[in-house]
Amino acid sequence: MSDLKTMMLNFGPQHPAAHGVLRLVLEMDGEIIERADPHIGLLHRGTEKLIEHKTYLQALPYFDRLDYVSPMSQEHAYSLCVEKLLQCEVPIRAKYLRVLFCELTRILNHLLNISSQALDVGAMTPLLWLFEEREKILEFYERASGARFHAAYIRPGGVAADVPEGLIEDIAKFIEQFPQYIDDVDELLTENRIWKQRTVGISEISIKQALDWGFSGPMLRAAGLAWDLRKSQPYEIYDQLDFDIPVGQNGDCYDRYLVRMEEIRQSVSLVKQCIEKIPEGPVKTEDRKISPPPRTEMKRSMEALIHHFKLYSEGYHVPEGEAYAAVEAPKGEFGVYIVSDGTNRPYRCRIRAPGFAHLQALDFMAKGHMLADVAAIIGSLDIVFGEIDR
């Protein structure tokens, strides 16, 4: 029996089911996976180093380019971290707008994940249905910020600008008809025999194992632990909103899918609550050293013009110190740790990407499964290499 050899198989980095540039070296015993070795770094752009040479405002767009399928969540974490260092108050309307767009971002992310995971195991219809809905949300992004993806909308001190007239009403109309599409996908997948055969019991993980690997977000909740930063460590106005935390039982691919489906419904409810409660008022801090003055003021006041020039040429100086801010991003806990040396540039910025912890457990989760299950497992991890490779 000693002459039995395992086979080495390269999965990716051009494989469509690799969800980006993942090179996976699989050690196979026939169809069974003995070892899975992820090779990352093919999308490494040195973001953390680049940020050290930019002002605090110039560093913001880099965060859109990390997890590029849910951009606003990353900006949010960065802005909260800078605001902690500046000890700056954000107007209440800006907080509502932030939460509104972050929940739309969560829907955006889960629509992509569910449809592409279904495509990986052979179901094509959800992709065609859900991408149409994603396009509508991206249109809201564009109307608010001018860009479909790289919005740079949430900024330290508030948001870039107030939403244009009619946008809130259009989001309300969209949110009214949108749940019907989720029900259709639910009908198509949830009790589908083939879908269940491909996902039930695949890569099961317990709460303890999930915590040991550093899981967060839907991956941790699918294992059965109701841990959500929006409830456990509320930020912005989440403590004033009413929502449930969906949890799974078995921590397998199927439970992760169910958790994400329910999270979409909870996000719909949160968006409705934001639209009902959003007050009138300013959308950025009145401190002109942090946020630029309005154009009309600049045309009239020399002081406003100087503030504007200083802000965009030199940027603001952040007090010496360090801060960590984390948000419940669609993929898990997205954290930003900034060390400031009192200048206008961060001394060090560390980014905690949730996908990194999930991918490191791939060997543990894939061991003993079949080759065909790798696509289902990677799809359920919801990984994007912009944030993993940074």
Swiss-Prot record:
Gene3D superfamilies xrefs: Cytochrome-c3 Hydrogenase, chain B (1.10.645.10)
UniProt main location, coarse: membrane
One of the record's GO cellular component terms: plasma membrane
InterPro entries linked: NADH_Q_OxRdtase_suD (IPR001135), NADH_UbQ_OxRdtase_49kDa_CS (IPR014029), NDH1_su_D/H (IPR022885), NiFe-Hase_large (IPR029014)
EC identifiers of the protein: 7.1.1.-
Subcellular location, record wording: Cell membrane
Catalysed reactions, as listed in the record: a quinone + NADH + 5 H(+)(in) = a quinol + NAD(+) + 4 H(+)(out)
Superkingdom in the source lineage: Bacteria
Keyword terms of this UniProt record: Cell membrane, Membrane, NAD, Quinone, Translocase, Transport, Ubiquinone
Protein topology in the membrane: Peripheral membrane protein
GO MF annotation: an example: NAD binding
Pfam families reported for this sequence: Complex1_49kDa
Subunit-level organization: NDH-1 is composed of 14 different subunits. Subunits NuoB, C, D, E, F, and G constitute the peripheral sector of the complex.
Family membership noted in the UniProt record: Belongs to the complex I 49 kDa subunit family.
Function, as annotated: NDH-1 shuttles electrons from NADH, via FMN and iron-sulfur (Fe-S) centers, to quinones in the respiratory chain. The immediate electron acceptor for the enzyme in this species is believed to be ubiquinone. Couples the redox reaction to proton translocation (for every two electrons transferred, four hydrogen ions are translocated across the cytoplasmic membrane), and thus conserves the redox energy in a proton gradient.
PANTHER family: NADH DEHYDROGENASE [UBIQUINONE] IRON-SULFUR PROTEIN 2, MITOCHONDRIAL (PTHR11993:SF10), NADH-UBIQUINONE OXIDOREDUCTASE 49 KDA SUBUNIT (PTHR11993)
Name of the featured protein: NADH-quinone oxidoreductase subunit D
